[in-house]
């Protein structure tokens, strides 16, 4: 009897000495081609910018077969959703909110004043974005956790005005899923829009008038994950509003050695593959025995996985693989080059190995810190950079919703003390009017 084919493709980097750039080229990476859908999304954004809610509702009816009575969800529907929420789900959401607030409440930066001399100060003042739109996707699953992960840091930053946008659902009379509504109400958000996709992003950016004549006020910033069309719309609208990031398909990398339990490793790889057929699951290990055992576990666990078809497509896609390396040192180089959204460390000395990681959206240390914990109740944020963007970007946090403003205050004497240098530099850059703006202050 022949052995079943391996679930995951293998990439053997043992004996290879590659630069970070060469590693990135050798490692599996899927992702979606946002550029390819821009021609489709651009007219949607333009139409919503011109016709507002009417266009957004038309697109929703055309794409999804759902046309809500209005964009804004009535307060009574939010109250009813929270009242009807399953008690266990409500309790779990409350725990998630408490733990997420505990972590994020300490993240807010304080104003800092630097004195450069008598009468010369520069203060960095942190000011929250005034109005933020938080997108919560529909699709393969319901994501009340995304409501929490977006709303909590925005509230901790002091954002005054929040609106949650989520796709209307035919089975809920054109409202977003009631669990989404309940999560918003639980967090004290009273403005929820029943609109999804690229048209939701455009409506958040440009605003409009609802079917009852009420204003749909545009936002200053849009955050939250979504599909490729949502991502494309965020790209097109980012000159008008700020965005958090262009989210791609989710990904997990696991750095594991011979001490790791293949049952845990396989379960964690499957857990992220459950999100999307484009999700990436990557194991980086120096242990061929662990690679074999994990592949066998994957084959076995897939038999009882609820979303087997979706998970199998993700695991067998070009974005997923087992990467064999010489040792843990080589594995660290690989995962730093890969810059995963989620990185688990399951090695003999996991905390020490984790301290060497410089590029990851979030790091989960040891066998009892699975990514699923971070998705819900670790207290960390699960809106994280994908597609290698962890090399230069961070996950959603309180800082996402804050703007640093430099406040410069000099006295006459302080300006006079540095005026000669200002005039010299302005002259060197052939900007004489800059120097004159200083010199004329001391003419009389």
UniProtKB/Swiss-Prot annotation:
GO terms for molecular function: histidinol dehydrogenase activity; NAD binding; zinc ion binding. SUPFAM superfamilies: ALDH-like (SSF53720). The keyword NAD applies. The active site is at residues 341-342. Binds 1 zinc ion per subunit. Homodimer. This is Histidinol dehydrogenase.
């Amino acid at each position: 009897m022949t052995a079943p084919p391996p679930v995951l493709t293998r990439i053997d980097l043992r004996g290879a000495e590659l630069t970070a750039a060469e590693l990135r080229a050798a490692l599996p990476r899927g992702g979606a081609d946002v550029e390819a859908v821009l021609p489709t999304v651009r007219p949607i954004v333009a139409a919503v910018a011109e016709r507002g809610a009417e266009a957004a509702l038309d697109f929703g009816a055309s794409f999804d077969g759902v046309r809500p009575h209005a964009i804004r969800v009535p307060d009574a529907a939010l109250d009813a959703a929270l009242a009807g929420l399953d008690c266990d789900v409500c309790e779990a959401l409350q725990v998630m909110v408490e733990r997420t607030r505990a972590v994020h409440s300490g993240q807010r930066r304080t104003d800092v004043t630097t004195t450069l001399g008598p009468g010369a100060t520069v203060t960095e003042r942190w000011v929250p974005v005034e109005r933020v739109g938080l997108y919560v996707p529909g699709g393969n699953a319901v994501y009340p956790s995304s409501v929490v992960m977006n709303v909590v840091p925005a509230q901790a930053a002091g954002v005054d005005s929040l609106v949650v946008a989520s796709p209307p659902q035919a089975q809920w009379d054109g409202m977003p899923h009631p669990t989404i509504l309940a999560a918003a109400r639980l967090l004290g958000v009273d403005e929820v829009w029943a609109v999804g996709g690229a048209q939701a992003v455009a409506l958040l950016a440009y605003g409009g008038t609802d079917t009852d004549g009420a204003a749909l006020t545009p936002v200053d910033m849009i955050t939250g994950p979504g599909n490729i069309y949502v991502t494309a719309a965020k790209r097109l609208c980012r000159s008008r509003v700020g965005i958090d990031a262009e989210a791609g398909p989710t990904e997990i990398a696991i750095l594991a050695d011979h001490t790791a339990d293949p049952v845990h490793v396989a379960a964690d790889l499957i857990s992220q593959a459950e999100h999307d057929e484009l999700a990436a699951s990557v194991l980086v290990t120096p242990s061929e025995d662990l690679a074999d055992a994990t592949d066998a576990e994957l084959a076995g666990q897939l038999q009882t996985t609820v979303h087997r078809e979706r998970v199998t497509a993700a695991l067998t896609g070009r974005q997923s693989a087992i990467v064999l390396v010489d040792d843990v040192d080589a594995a660290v180089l690989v995962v730093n080059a890969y810059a995963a959204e989620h990185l688990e460390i399951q090695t003999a000395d996991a905390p020490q190995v984790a301290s060497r990681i410089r590029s990851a959206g979030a790091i989960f240390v040891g066998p009892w810190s699975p990514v699923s914990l971070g998705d819900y109740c670790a207290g960390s944020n699960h809106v994280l950079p994908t597609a290698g963007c962890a090399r230069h970007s961070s996950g959603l946090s309180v800082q996402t919703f804050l703007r640093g403003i430099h406040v410069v205050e000099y006295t006459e004497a302080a300006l006079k003390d540095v005026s000669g240098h200002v005039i010299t530099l302005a002259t060197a850059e052939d900007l004489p009017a800059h120097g004159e703006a200083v010199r004329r202050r001391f003419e009389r």
